[in-house]
A protein has these predicted regions:
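Second-shell loop/turn segments in exported
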Residues: 38, 78-88
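Hydrophobic/aromatic pocket-lining and membrane-interface residues
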Residues: 51, 80, 96
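Extended, aromatic/histidine-rich regions of cofactor-dependent oxidoreductases associated
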Residues: 1-50, 55, 60-63, 102-201
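Solvent-exposed, acidic/flexible segments
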Residues: 89-93
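Flexible, low-complexity segments enriched for small/polar residues
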Residues: 58-82
Length: 201
């Protein structure tokens, strides 16, 4: 236990010296589990993912179809609003920017924000420019393995910090677990926690 704490402190000093640890944050070598409500069951035969709202054509993919979309892999640091940070995490999944650039989805010029809709009606809002940035991913895998059920399997939104890149990086909670759809919107709208009084970041 003492050795693990020493390792954590040493690693924390390293990332702090590199300017990667924001003020008030502490490094964790674990991956804390934080969510509202029970973990939903996943059924691959009934699951689907929907793109809708301010798009030229609504899209709906089955689990097999979603896994056939172009894949991306990104290494990012993640920062939680509860003051822990985890570094050099490698996420794999589908980039919304790639979907747009390839014409698989066509976003209307009127779209300014995106609502992530998850199981149990949970919602998370983000500006469109964040969803289209390199540091946002519709993730299925973490560090080479499928994400676990308590971390959002089969699909979660992930937003993180890419060292050396000047990208808008909201806190990690702005990526929804158990994601089921993206709604492209002509204006911002509060998500679940914003309606409960949380800051819109």
């Amino acid at each position: 236990m003492f050795s693990m704490d020493q390792d954590r402190r040493k690693e924390e000093e390293r990332v702090r010296s590199e300017g990667r640890l924001p003020p008030g944050q502490a490094l964790t070598l674990k991956f804390p589990v934080l969510h509202y409500g029970p973990v939903p069951a996943f059924n691959a035969s009934t699951w689907d993912f929907r793109i809708w709202g301010e798009v030229e054509q609504e899209k709906r993919w089955t689990w097999d179809e979603f896994n056939g979309l172009p894949r991306a892999k990104i290494q990012m640091d993640i920062h939680c609003v509860t003051r822990w940070s985890k570094f050099d995490t490698v996420w794999e999944g589908v980039s919304v920017r790639t979907l747009a650039d390839s014409g698989l989805i066509k976003i209307k010029p009127s779209a300014t924000h995106v609502m992530q809709h998850a199981e149990y009606g949970f919602t998370v809002n983000l500006p469109l420019e964040v969803v289209l940035a390199d540091n946002f991913l519709l993730a299925t895998h973490l560090n080479g393995e499928p994400i676990t059920a308590d971390h959002g399997y089969p699909l979660r939104g992930v937003v993180g910090f890419i060292p050396g890149r000047e990208l808008d990086t909201p806190y990690f909670w702005k990526g929804a677990k158990w994601l089921r759809s993206l709604e492209f919107m002509p204006h911002d709208r509060e998500g679940f926690w914003e309606q409960a009084g949380y800051h819109n970041r």
